[in-house]
C-alpha cells in the first residue's frame, strides 16, 4: 500500500530520551520509530543511523544529536537522542532541543545510576515539564519483586527533584525485543503503551503564537515625521496596531502604544510569533529604547538581576577558557540580543569550575533583564562564548 502524502494536521510535540549510559536510550528510540512507522507511516530508523548522530552547533557549542520523527494516532513527535552524556548536558542547557517531555530510560537490571539522577536534575533545572519512565531490559529480570523495587527507586528519585513520582507513568518493556519484532507484552505492546502514555500524560504544548506578546529589541530607528521604529523578531504572541505595550529591561519599565506594524516595507494590522517586524511606537524617543530590552504585553514579564542558573562551561577544545574560574568571576551574560556584566557565586562545596564542567551557580547582574525561568543565555568573555546557561530560579 502506498503511503499517503505527509500532512501536518496533528499537533506537534517535542520529546527526547534521557538516562544512564547503556540503559538503552538509542535502542528504545529505534524501537519507537520502527513500531510506530509500521502503524502510522513515517520512517523506521535503524540503531546505527541514530547512533551516528550528526554534529550541530547551538550557541557556539558543538553537540551531537540524532533527530527522529514518528506519529501516534493523535500526534506528531520530534524525538531527540544524544550519543554521549556530555551531549545531553550541553543539549539540555543550551535548549538546542527544547523538550515538552522526556522519556527516562532506566535498565531494570541495573536500577537508577549516577546519570539517571543527573539527567532528572538537569530536566528539573532546565524546565523539562514532564517525565515518563520506560523500564527497559525487563526480559532480563525474572523477579517481580525486583522490578517493583526498581520502580520504587525511580519514583523516589523523581520525587526528590520535584517531579510527581507517584503519578509518573512507568512502562515496563524491552526495547531490544520490540526492535526485533517481538509482539509480546515486553516488545511491541510495551511500545504501544509508551506511545499512549506520551499522548495522554504530556499535554499539548501552547503554541508560540498563543503566548503573551514578547519581542526582543534588535534595532531602533528614528523616522522623521513618523516617530521611533523598533525592529526585531516576535518571539511569542501577537501584536496588533493600537495595543499598549511595555518596554522592559536595563532601565525603568516604560509604557507605550504600538501605532504601526511593518514587515518587508508593507504596513500590517498585526505581527505574530516568528515574524521579523518593525513596530512604530507612539511618543517614544529614539534614545528611550535600546538593544537588549524587550517589548511585551504589559505585566507579562518583569526585569530581574538576581537568579540561579544551570551552566555548561566550554572546554578548551571547544574554544572555551584554558583555566578554571573561581567565586566572584565576572563575565558578560548574553541575553537575547545584548551582553550584561554579572558576578558568579559558586556553590559552597565548589572552589572552582573547570572548562568542560556543568554547575549550578547564582548570578547578580549589574543591569536588570526581562527574565523568566527557562530563559537561555551565553556566558562571554571579550566577545567569545565561554559557556551556556539557563535560568533555573529567579531570586530578585
Swiss-Prot record:
<dbReference type="InterPro" id="IPR050055">
    <property type="entry name" value="EF-Tu_GTPase"/>
</dbReference>
<dbReference type="InterPro" id="IPR000795">
    <property type="entry name" value="T_Tr_GTP-bd_dom"/>
</dbReference>
<feature type="binding site">
    <location>
        <begin position="81"/>
        <end position="85"/>
    </location>
    <ligand>
        <name>GTP</name>
    </ligand>
</feature>
<dbReference type="InterPro" id="IPR005225">
    <property type="entry name" value="Small_GTP-bd"/>
</dbReference>
<feature type="region of interest" description="G4">
    <location>
        <begin position="136"/>
        <end position="139"/>
    </location>
</feature>
<dbReference type="GO" id="GO:0005829">
    <property type="term" value="C:cytosol"/>
</dbReference>
<dbReference type="GO" id="GO:0003746">
    <property type="term" value="F:translation elongation factor activity"/>
</dbReference>
<feature type="region of interest" description="G5">
    <location>
        <begin position="174"/>
        <end position="176"/>
    </location>
</feature>
<dbReference type="InterPro" id="IPR031157">
    <property type="entry name" value="G_TR_CS"/>
</dbReference>
<dbReference type="InterPro" id="IPR033720">
    <property type="entry name" value="EFTU_2"/>
</dbReference>
<dbReference type="GO" id="GO:0097216">
    <property type="term" value="F:guanosine tetraphosphate binding"/>
</dbReference>
<keyword id="KW-0378">Hydrolase</keyword>
<dbReference type="InterPro" id="IPR004160">
    <property type="entry name" value="Transl_elong_EFTu/EF1A_C"/>
</dbReference>
<keyword id="KW-0479">Metal-binding</keyword>
<protein>
    <recommendedName>
        <fullName>Elongation factor Tu</fullName>
        <ecNumber>3.6.5.3</ecNumber>
    </recommendedName>
</protein>
<keyword id="KW-0963">Cytoplasm</keyword>
<dbReference type="Pfam" id="PF03143">
    <property type="entry name" value="GTP_EFTU_D3"/>
</dbReference>
<feature type="region of interest" description="G1">
    <location>
        <begin position="19"/>
        <end position="26"/>
    </location>
</feature>
<keyword id="KW-0342">GTP-binding</keyword>
<keyword id="KW-0547">Nucleotide-binding</keyword>
<dbReference type="InterPro" id="IPR004541">
    <property type="entry name" value="Transl_elong_EFTu/EF1A_bac/org"/>
</dbReference>
<dbReference type="InterPro" id="IPR027417">
    <property type="entry name" value="P-loop_NTPase"/>
</dbReference>
<keyword id="KW-0648">Protein biosynthesis</keyword>
<dbReference type="InterPro" id="IPR041709">
    <property type="entry name" value="EF-Tu_GTP-bd"/>
</dbReference>
<comment type="function">
    <text>GTP hydrolase that promotes the GTP-dependent binding of aminoacyl-tRNA to the A-site of ribosomes during protein biosynthesis.</text>
</comment>
<comment type="subunit">
    <text>Monomer.</text>
</comment>
<dbReference type="InterPro" id="IPR009001">
    <property type="entry name" value="Transl_elong_EF1A/Init_IF2_C"/>
</dbReference>
<feature type="region of interest" description="G3">
    <location>
        <begin position="81"/>
        <end position="84"/>
    </location>
</feature>
<feature type="binding site">
    <location>
        <position position="26"/>
    </location>
    <ligand>
        <name>Mg(2+)</name>
    </ligand>
</feature>
<dbReference type="InterPro" id="IPR004161">
    <property type="entry name" value="EFTu-like_2"/>
</dbReference>
<dbReference type="Pfam" id="PF00009">
    <property type="entry name" value="GTP_EFTU"/>
</dbReference>
<comment type="similarity">
    <text>Belongs to the TRAFAC class translation factor GTPase superfamily. Classic translation factor GTPase family. EF-Tu/EF-1A subfamily.</text>
</comment>
<keyword id="KW-0460">Magnesium</keyword>
<dbReference type="Pfam" id="PF03144">
    <property type="entry name" value="GTP_EFTU_D2"/>
</dbReference>
<dbReference type="GO" id="GO:0003924">
    <property type="term" value="F:GTPase activity"/>
</dbReference>
<dbReference type="InterPro" id="IPR009000">
    <property type="entry name" value="Transl_B-barrel_sf"/>
</dbReference>
<feature type="binding site">
    <location>
        <begin position="136"/>
        <end position="139"/>
    </location>
    <ligand>
        <name>GTP</name>
    </ligand>
</feature>
<feature type="domain" description="tr-type G">
    <location>
        <begin position="10"/>
        <end position="206"/>
    </location>
</feature>
<feature type="binding site">
    <location>
        <begin position="19"/>
        <end position="26"/>
    </location>
    <ligand>
        <name>GTP</name>
    </ligand>
</feature>
<dbReference type="GO" id="GO:0005525">
    <property type="term" value="F:GTP binding"/>
</dbReference>
<feature type="region of interest" description="G2">
    <location>
        <begin position="60"/>
        <end position="64"/>
    </location>
</feature>
<keyword id="KW-0251">Elongation factor</keyword>
